[in-house]
Amino acid sequence: MDNQFPSRKGPCFCSFRYVLALFMHFCNIVIIAQRMCLSLTMVAMVNNTNLHGSPNTSAEKRLDNTKNPVYNWSPDVQGIIFSSIFYGAFLIQIPVGYISGIYSIKKLIGFALFLSSLVSIFIPQAAAVGETWIIVCRVVQGITQGTVTTAQHEIWVKWAPPLERGRLTSMSLSGFLLGPFIVLLVTGIICESLGWPMVFYIFGACGCAVCLLWFVLYYDDPKDHPCVSLHEKEYITSSLIQQGSSTRQSLPIKAMIKSLPLWAISFCCFAYLWTYSRLIVYTPTLINSMLHVDIRENGLLSSLPYLFAWICGVIAGHTADFLMSRNMLSLTAIRKLFTAIGLLLPIVFSMCLLYLSSGFYSTITFLILANASSSFCLGGALINALDLAPRYYVFIKGVTTLIGMTGGMTSSTVAGLFLSQDPESSWFKIFLLMSIINVISVIFYLIFAKAEIQDWAKEKQHTRL
């Protein structure tokens, strides 16, 4: 049976925990901006008229424009530069998941964010030295950003009352959805007016400013924070009594491997990032093939799904908490409902995009809905691990994120293979494969998912390897 949480309400939107969630929202916007900006500035950085006539060296660049130096990097080198940040993020997930329960989150996130921002500032200089150095910089950024994105889940183990987990986590994580929309809007303007190096300087400086505020605002334990009212401290502490101490014990690896609810979460994370990556990475390609618009209009249209995904993500978290606070559905039912919506609706709207869209507006509408509806998973499987095992939440998030990233990388590769082999029927094959993966994941989740603390995650357990 689901946990029964205290129904009394504490201070809400004027409370410090919501200030913290909003701050993490902006922090995640900065992180995703630093991650994405190279993909957009690469258009200005590369000499597209001479990709095959010169070797891949940064020394061979146009000297007539010091504000916008241009390099002769082949598409292969560009691909390595693009992917290098994901290798760093991929490698760090499980180590960060483990040490987050041991070391200070304030120091871990703060130093990682500062290093990522510092590297961003030095990327133009690295590009001038050689493509090897920019690859190294991006790997380091992947490691530091992977640290921030995974370790931040530990914040809500101590700061989020059970009845507010959905809205607090969705508020903070939705920064990853709004960030791309902002980046797509401002990066082109900065490149044209100030030069592409200023993109890295600006986002790096923003990261340093956010890092400074982080060290001032955040405390690992709300009980120690001087700006949190006594009433709010008591509310948070009393609401978290049922989950027990958050002190890390030895990891119950065997119990985790045997846990079907954890496997259900893992499958859904794989399906979510498969869907999200396929929809986001290939949205510009799909728009170009269906609407044949110019690149500037394509960029604007491609940014709209991010905006609506952000709106849906925030709505999902608030709605999930509303249903739970009113006892309208059990927590397990809520998690299953939002996961099913987030994985099944993209299938419906993607098929509508292929077979029912007959004009510009219907195509864009179905495209936005297919992207945005996946954000309902923020109220479902994506935060379900916090219900099952608060003590090991960040470690589990590291593992499930690693599994999900595998789905994301595989999705892009498979979609590329389909598009290169059979452009005529490729989109149907891509959507069909996504449908199969999502449906299987939802069925498994509906059968095995739970939302109460598992026996192996309770304080009395001392399961060892």
Swiss-Prot record:
Subcellular localization(s) per the UniProt record: Apical cell membrane
Reactions listed under catalytic activity: 3 Na(+)(out) + phosphate(out) = 3 Na(+)(in) + phosphate(in); urate(out) = urate(in)
One Gene Ontology molecular-function label: phosphate transmembrane transporter activity
GO cellular component: apical plasma membrane
Glycosylation sites: 47, 56
Topology relative to the membrane: Multi-pass membrane protein
Family, as annotated: Belongs to the major facilitator superfamily. Sodium/anion cotransporter family.
Name of the protein in its database record: Sodium-dependent phosphate transport protein 1
Organism of provenance: Oryctolagus cuniculus
